[in-house]
C-alpha cells in the first residue's frame, strides 16, 4: 500500500501537460512564416487533428501538444525529432548527434506512429541506427498525441502519434518563396532549404529542396567523435487541384541520409577515440563505416464534400532502402529494401444534432527483401487492415468523444539457409520459415468539461493494441551502429494497453498552466535483455553483446506539468516538468524497471521581448533556458543491460529578431549558444553510453555534444 500511495503522490506532484505551444495559433502568412512574438491565444482557438478527427484543442479529452511554426523555425536542432524533444513528455533515443528516435512517456520505436503527409511513415523504425526520414524544414507544425491512439492509426500507436503537418495551401491567387540557411559551430553543421509555393485559380503547388551536412561533433571528454558525421538531402513536390467539391493533391518526396557509424574504439593507453591515420575530423566526406538511407514516397490525397460531411481517400507508396558499408565504399554488407503501400478511406458526417461521427478503414501492405550479404531480419510480407468508428458530442459545457476499432495483421517470414565457409560443415539456418496472425480491439472514451471560463477538466480512458514487429519476432544478426547482436522470439504475444488520463488546463492573461496525469497498464510488454551464460558472463556473438527479446507485464505512471507566467507584457517565465515511472511487474529487483525510461526532466526559461521602433527591427527577444535531467536510478539492471545515469544541467541562450524594410519583413535572424558551460554529459537514452570503457579515465561510452553556437537566417519572398 505504501508503494501505491507514494506513486499517487508523485503523480500529483510531478504530472503534466502540454507545451507552451498549445497556446499558439497555426495560421501562417503567405510566406509560410510567423512573427516572433509569443501570443497567449486561448485554447479554444487552436484546432488539432485529435484522436477522433479535427476538433478544437479545448474539447479534446486526450492529451495533445502542438508545436507551432514559429517554435520549429526558431529552435536549433540537428533533425526533426531533436526539434520536438523539448516538449514535456517527449524524449529521444539517440545514436550520435544526427540520429534520433521519438519517445513518448517512456515508450518508443514501434510504439510511436509517425504521420507525415497524412500517412504513417514506414522506414524500418525498429532499428536504432537511423532516424525518421523526414526533412525538418518541410514540417510546418507538429501535433503530439500522448497515450494509446490506435483508433485512427491502428497497431503501433500504443505510446502515441506524432503528426508532422506540411504547410497549408496558400490562399487563391498568391505565390510565395522562402530561403533558409543555418550553421552550427560544434559539428560544422550547414543546412539550407529553398521553398516555392502558390495557388493560381485552384491549381496549387509546393516545392522544396533541402540539404544538410555535418562533420564529427566534439565534447570535452572525447574530443571529436569519429563516425558521427552525416549528410542529408531531400526534395518534395506537391501538385494539386482545389475546387468547390474538395481537392486532389499528389505529393512526391525523396529523402537521402548518409550517416557515419560511431564504433567507440579507443587507444588503450591514451583513451583517445581511434581514427584512421591522417583523418581530418572536420571533413564532411564519408568515412568507413557508414550507412546510406534512401526513402521515396508518393501520396495521393483526395477529399470530396458530401453535403456538410466529407469522404477522404488516401493512397501511398513508400520505398525504404537501408545499407551499411563496413569494409568498402562500393560494396555494402547489410542491404534492406522495404516496400509499403498505405491506404485510408473514411467518412466524416455532418453535425447530427450534437453528434459528429466518423467511420472508415485503413491499413498497409509491406514486403521486405534482403539484398546484401549480411542479415538482421528475414525477408517478410505483411498485410493489415483496421475498421474504426469514432464519435464526438457537445452538450452544454461538456464534450464527449470515443470510438472503437478492430485490427487484423498477418506476417510471414521466409526461411534462410546460409552456406558455411567450411565446405565440410553443414549449412547454417539463419532464419526459420514462420507465419503469425494478430487480432486486436481498441477503444476510448473521454470527456472535456469547462469548470470555469478559463479552467477545463479532462478525463480519458483508452485501450490500445500492438502486434510484435519483425525484429522482435525473428531478428538474428548484429546491429553495427549499436554493437548489439539481437535474437528474436516468434512466440511473442501482442501488447495490450489500457491507460487513464486526467488533466487540467488553465488560461488567463497572466498565467497559462496545464497538468496531465497518466497511469498505463500493459500486458506482454516486449523488450530486449542482455544474455549471460551459466557463469554470469555476457554472451558474445560475432564480437558483440547478445540480446534476446522477451516480454512481461508493465505499469507506467507519471505525467507532465507546464506553467507559463508573464507578469509583464514582454516577460515570460516558463517551467515544465516530466516524469515517468516504468515498472515491470512480478520481477526481481534487477529486472524491476523497464529499459530506456527517460530521467525526470525540468525545463525552464525566461524570455524577454525587447521593445523596438518596428521600422528596422521588430519582435526582438532574448531567452535564457535551463535543461535539467535528474539522476536516473530506475534502470533495467538484469544482465548488465543498463546502468544508472548521473544528473546534469545544461544552460542555453537564445535570441532572435525580424528585420524590416519599408514596413515589410525581409528576414528573420536567430542565434543561440547551447550548453554554454561545455558540460560533458550522457543522456540516459543515448545508445553511445554503453560503448567501450575509456581505460585511461575509467569512463564508459561516448559523451554527448559539447558547447554549440548556432545562427539561422530565414528570408521570406513575396511574389
Spans of features found by a protein language model:
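Outer-membrane beta-barrel proteins, especially TonB-dependent receptors
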Residues: 24, 36-42, 50-67, 71-75, ...
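A short linear hydrophobic-aromatic micro-motif
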Residues: 89-93
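Localized edge beta-strand/strand-to-loop motifs within extracellular or lumenal beta-rich domains
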Residues: 657-658
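Active-site-adjacent helical/loop segments in soluble small-molecule enzymes
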Residues: 84
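Short, solvent-exposed loop/turn segments that connect beta-strands within catalytic domains
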Residues: 613-617, 661-666
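Gly/Thr-rich phosphate-binding loop signature of adenosyl cofactor/nucleotide-binding cores
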Residues: 673-675
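Cleavable N-terminal targeting peptides that direct proteins into the secretory/outer-membrane pathway or into
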Residues: 1-33
Amino acid at each position: 500500500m505504501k508503494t501505491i500511495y507514494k506513486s499517487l503522490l508523485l503523480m500529483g506532484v510531478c504530472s503534466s501537460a502540454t507545451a507552451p505551444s498549445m497556446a499558439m495559433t497555426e495560421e501562417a502568412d503567405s510566406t509560410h512564416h510567423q512573427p516572433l512574438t509569443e501570443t497567449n491565444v486561448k485554447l479554444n482557438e487552436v484546432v488539432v487533428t485529435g484522436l477522433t478527427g479535427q476538433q478544437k484543442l479545448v474539447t479534446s479529452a486526450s492529451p495533445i501538444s502542438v508545436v507551432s511554426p514559429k517554435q520549429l523555425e526558431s529552435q536549433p536542432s540537428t533533425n526533426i525529432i531533436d526539434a520536438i524533444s523539448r516538449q514535456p513528455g517527449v524524449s529521444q533515443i539517440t545514436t550520435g548527434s544526427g540520429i534520433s528516435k521519438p519517445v513518448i512517456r517512456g515508450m518508443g520505436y514501434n510504439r510511436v506512429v509517425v504521420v507525415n503527409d497524412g500517412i504513417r511513415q514506414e522506414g524500418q523504425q525498429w532499428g536504432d541506427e537511423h532516424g525518421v526520414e523526414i526533412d525538418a524544414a518541410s514540417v510546418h507544425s507538429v501535433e503530439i498525441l500522448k497515450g494509446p491512439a490506435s483508433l485512427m492509426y491502428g497497431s503501433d500507436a500504443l505510446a502515441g502519434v506524432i503528426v508532422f503537418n506540411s504547410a497549408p495551401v496558400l490562399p487563391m491567387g498568391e505565390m510565395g518563396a522562402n530561403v533558409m540557411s543555418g550553421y552550427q559551430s560544434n559539428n560544422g553543421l550547414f543546412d539550407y532549404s529553398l521553398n516555392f509555393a502558390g495557388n493560381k485559380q485552384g491549381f496549387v503547388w509546393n516545392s522544396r529542396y533541402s540539404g544538410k551536412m555535418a562533420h564529427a561533433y566534439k565534447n570535452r571528454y572525447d574530443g571529436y567523435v569519429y563516425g558521427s558525421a552525416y549528410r542529408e538531402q531531400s526534395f518534395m513536390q506537391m501538385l494539386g487541384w482545389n475546387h468547390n467539391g474538395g481537392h486532389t493533391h499528389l505529393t512526391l518526396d525523396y529523402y537521402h541520409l548518409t550517416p557515419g557509424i560511431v564504433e567507440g574504439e579507443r587507444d588503450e593507453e591514451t583513451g583517445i577515440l581511434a581514427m584512421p591515420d591522417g583523418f581530418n575530423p572536420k571533413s564532411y566526406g564519408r568515412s568507413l563505416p557508414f550507412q546510406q538511407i534512401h526513402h521515396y514516397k508518393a501520396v495521393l490525397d483526395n477529399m470530396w464534400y458530401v453535403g456538410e460531411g466529407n469522404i477522404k481517400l488516401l493512397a501511398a507508396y513508400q520505398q525504404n532502402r537501408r545499407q551499411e558499408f563496413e569494409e568498402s565504399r562500393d560494396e555494402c554488407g547489410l542491404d534492406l529494401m522495404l516496400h509499403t503501400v498505405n491506404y485510408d478511406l473514411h467518412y466524416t458526417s455532418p453535425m447530427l444534432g450534437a453528434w459528429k461521427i466518423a467511420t472508415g478503414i485503413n491499413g498497409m501492405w509491406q514486403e521486405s527483401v534482403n539484398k546484401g550479404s549480411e542479415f538482421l531480419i528475414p525477408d517478410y510480407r505483411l498485410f493489415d487492415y483496421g475498421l474504426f468508428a469514432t464519435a464526438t458530442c457537445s452538450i452544454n459545457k461538456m464534450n464527449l468523444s470515443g470510438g472503437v476499432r478492430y485490427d487484423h495483421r498477418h506476417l510471414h517470414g521466409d526461411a534462410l539457409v546460409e552456406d558455411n565457409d567450411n565446405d565440410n560443415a553443414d549449412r547454417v539456418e539463419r532464419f526459420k520459415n514462420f507465419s503469425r496472425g494478430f487480432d486486436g480491439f481498441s477503444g476510448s472514451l473521454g470527456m472535456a468539461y469547462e469548470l470555469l471560463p478559463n479552467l477545463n477538466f479532462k478525463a480519458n480512458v483508452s485501450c490500445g493494441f500492438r502486434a510484435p514487429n519483425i525484429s522482435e519476432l525473428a531478428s538474428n544478426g548484429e546491429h553495427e551502429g549499436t554493437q548489439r547482436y539481437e535474437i528474436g522470439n516468434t512466440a511473442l504475444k501482442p501488447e495490450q494497453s489500457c491507460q487513464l488520463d486526467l488533466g487540467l488546463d488553465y488560461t488567463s492573461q497572466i498565467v497559462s498552466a496545464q497538468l496531465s496525469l497518466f497511469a498505463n497498464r500493459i500486458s506482454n510488454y516486449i523488450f530486449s535483455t542482455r544474455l549471460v551464460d551459466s557463469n554470469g558472463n555476457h554472451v558474445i556473438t560475432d564480437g558483440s553483446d547478445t540480446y534476446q527479446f522477451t516480454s512481461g507485464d508493465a505499469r507506467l505512471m507519471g505525467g507532465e506539468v507546464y506553467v507559463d507566467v508573464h507578469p509583464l507584457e514582454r516577460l515570460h517565465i516558463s517551467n515544465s516538468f516530466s516524469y515517468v515511472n516504468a515498472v515491470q511487474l512480478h520481477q526481481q529487483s534487477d529486472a524491476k524497471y523497464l529499459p530506456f525510461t527517460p530521467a525526470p526532466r525540468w525545463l525552464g526559461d525566461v524570455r524577454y521581448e525587447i521593445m523596438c521602433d518596428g521600422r528596422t527591427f521588430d519582435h526582438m527577444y532574448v531567452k535564457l533556458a535551463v535543461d535539467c535531467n535528474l539522476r536516473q536510478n530506475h534502470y533495467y539492471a538484469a544482465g548488465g543491460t543498463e546502468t544508472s545515469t548521473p544528473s546534469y544541467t545544461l544552460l542555453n541562450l537564445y535570441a532572435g529578431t525580424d528585420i524590416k524594410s519599408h514596413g515589410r519583413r525581409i528576414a528573420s535572424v536567430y542565434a543561440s549558444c547551447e550548453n554554454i558551460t561545455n558540460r560533458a554529459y550522457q543522456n540516459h537514452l543515448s545508445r553511445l553510453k554503453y560503448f567501450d570503457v575509456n581505460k585511461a579515465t575509467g569512463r564508459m561510452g561516448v559523451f554527448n555534444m559539447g558547447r554549440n553556437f548556432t545562427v539561422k537566417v530565414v528570408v521570406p519572398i513575396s511574389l
